[in-house]
């Protein structure tokens, strides 16, 4: 058969097919984790620099002076639990104890909510075990009115900023006390008055949103900065790169954080690019400052976030921070990590546990004891238990104490457009037919209303636990 492609190859100077005979076949590289279930964890690939060995650039330095450090790691706590090196933030013992307690409270909250999901009180939960320092120390380093655009494992920021635990539990249970009225997946909090932007289930969308908010803050001549968090898996999304481009071009006052906890659900971090270089090293490609941090070192996290926040507030531009850490639990209550990683990975993680490392540092300073640690753990567990008991008075999943069904169509338009009115009426009719036992006492709420009508009537219905 004649080679019909020969004229085309000749036109473009390409070699004839026969000339390629000695070339090896093309191959693809598929990343593989360092160990699998049943295997001994392998951390031989991990290079951990000594604490205090990385230089601390001036906050006003050119971005290029930070790039060498993106291949190293900001570390403050050494093997003897001492704070060493130029990144030591020199925090007073009382601040350290407050951070320790907030991290312990976050972990106790996670444990209680996890058990609640297993008991059927909520449909879903995600823990932050092993990553508490990133949220809590980060919150302590920021100003209270800086806007945070979080991912779903930053509950520690809300807790550090004093958001009521009961309100968080109401949202998780989607009960009648839920300020979001059951419209968000559990753990997708929203608290503008606490500088906490609504969590989205769409990965990485918060990155460009944070950059846009920071740009708006600068346009208004404000002094507040923005910060955002994504996992390393989400850094493979296009929104990550769009955010980096806008942040670099407009010198936006924003801190962009990548929490590299090694796993994106069951996907090894190599699928997001971890085998090639660090995630912090991407900063150089965009011409912005970059830092790589021991995410289990509370003092290092605080110091890095403070450095980047001060830089942004002084119009020094954006910073990309990678927190190197480990997701100690499953991705969520719907995940079984034993199906894809070694069960010993958590215990053998070389960077340890953030809560114990900070506690041991305080003990080394003579400012803490093991007995105080035990008592603190008891206190925070009781605090969470009391908040849970109070929230459960508003109902749990399937209990019946929830916002009326029809309210899902409210609070967007002042007057519902005709198409939503039709959809609402159809949904209510179908619900009555499919689940007649769920139809409570008839009331005027059986038809769609305006937002103003809905707010007044829903309050009355909620007091009875009725409604469609």
Go through the PLM ranges and name each one.
Residues 108-111, 115-252, 268-275, 280-281, ...:
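Cofactor-binding active-site loop characterized by glycine-rich and histidine/acidic residues
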Residues 65-67, 138-141, 246-247, 310-313:
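A general structural signal for short secondary-structure junctions and capping/turn motifs
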Residues 82-83, 155, 261-264:
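A short, flexible beta-alpha/helix-coil linker loop
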Residues 67-70, 96-98, 141-143, 182, ...:
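A generic structural signal for short, non-catalytic loop/turn and secondary-structure boundary residues
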Residues 4, 195-396:
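Glycine-rich ThDP/TPP pyrophosphate-binding loop and its adjacent helix/strand module
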Residues 1-134, 329, 338, 343-468:
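Conserved acidic/glycine
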């Amino acid at each position: 058969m004649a080679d019909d492609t020969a004229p085309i190859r000749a036109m473009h100077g390409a070699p004839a097919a026969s000339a390629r005979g000695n070339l090896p076949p093309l191959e693809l590289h598929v990343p593989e984790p360092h160990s699998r279930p049943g295997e001994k964890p392998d951390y031989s690939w991990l290079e951990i620099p000594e604490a205090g060995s990385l230089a601390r650039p001036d906050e006003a330095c050119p971005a290029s002076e930070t790039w060498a450090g993106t291949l190293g790691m900001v570390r403050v706590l050494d093997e003897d639990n001492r704070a060493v090196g130029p990144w030591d933030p020199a925090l007073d013992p009382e601040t350290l104890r407050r951070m320790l307690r907030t991290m312990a409270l976050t972990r106790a909250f996670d444990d209680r909510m996890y058990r609640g999901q297993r008991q059927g009180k909520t449909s879903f939960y995600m823990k932050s075990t092993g990553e508490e320092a990133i949220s809590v120390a980060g919150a302590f380093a920021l100003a209270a009115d800086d806007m945070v655009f979080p991912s779903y494992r930053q509950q520690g920021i809300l807790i550090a900023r004093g958001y009521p635990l009961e309100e968080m539990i109401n949202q998780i249970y989607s009960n009648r006390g839920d300020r979001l009225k059951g419209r968000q997946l559990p753990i997708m909090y929203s608290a503008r008055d606490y500088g906490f932007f609504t969590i989205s289930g769409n990965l990485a969308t918060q990155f460009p949103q944070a950059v846009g908010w920071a740009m708006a803050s600068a346009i208004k001549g404000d002094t507040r900065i923005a910060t955002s968090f994504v996992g390393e898996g989400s850094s493979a999304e296009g929104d990550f790169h769009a955010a980096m481009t806008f942040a670099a071009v407009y010198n936006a006052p924003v801190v962009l954080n990548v929490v590299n906890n090694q796993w994106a659900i069951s996907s090894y971090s190599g699928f997001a690019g971890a085998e090639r270089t660090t995630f912090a090293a991407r900063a150089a490609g965009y011409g912005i400052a970059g830092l790589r941090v021991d995410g289990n070192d509370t003092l290092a996290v605080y110091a890095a976030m403070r450095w980047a926040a001060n830089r942004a507030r002084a119009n020094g531009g954006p910073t990309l921070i990678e927190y190197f850490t480990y997701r100690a639990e499953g991705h969520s209550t719907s995940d079984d990590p034993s199906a894809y990683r070694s069960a010993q990975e958590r215990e053998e993680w070389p960077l340890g546990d953030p809560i114990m490392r900070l506690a041991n540092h305080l003990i080394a300073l003579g400012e803490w004891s093991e007995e105080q640690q035990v008592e603190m753990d008891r206190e925070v567990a009781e605090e969470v238990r009391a908040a849970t008991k109070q929230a459960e008075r508003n109902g749990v999943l399937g209990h019946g104490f929830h916002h009326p069904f029809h309210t899902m169509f409210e609070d967007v338009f002042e007057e519902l457009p005709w198409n939503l009115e039709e959809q609402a009426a159809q949904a209510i009719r179908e619900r009555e037919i499919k689940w007649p036992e769920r139809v409570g006492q008839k009331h005027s709420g059986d038809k769609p209303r305006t937002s103003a009508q809905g707010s007044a009537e829903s309050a009355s219905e909620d007091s009875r636990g009725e409604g469609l």
